[in-house]
């Protein structure tokens, strides 16, 4: 159970962190193009 939860957490972080980073870059680029 604990190992599975840890694995799911690590996987979630691996997915969320790069995704949020790409979203931030996309928003900055979009806002720069708009202005």
Swiss-Prot record:
Highest taxon in the source lineage: Eukaryota
InterPro entries named in the record: PSII_PsbM (IPR007826), PSII_PsbM_sf (IPR037269)
Chain segments annotated as transmembrane: 5-25
Primary residence: plastid
Membrane topology label: Single-pass membrane protein
Job description of the protein: One of the components of the core complex of photosystem II (PSII). PSII is a light-driven water:plastoquinone oxidoreductase that uses light energy to abstract electrons from H(2)O, generating O(2) and a proton gradient subsequently used for ATP formation. It consists of a core antenna complex that captures photons, and an electron transfer chain that converts photonic excitation into a charge separation. This subunit is found at the monomer-monomer interface.
Stated name of the protein: Photosystem II reaction center protein M
Gene that encodes it: psbM
């Amino acid at each position: 159970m604990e190992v599975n939860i840890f694995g799911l957490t690590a996987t979630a972080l691996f997915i969320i962190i790069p995704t949020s980073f790409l979203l931030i870059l996309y928003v900055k680029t979009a806002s720069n193009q708009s202005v």
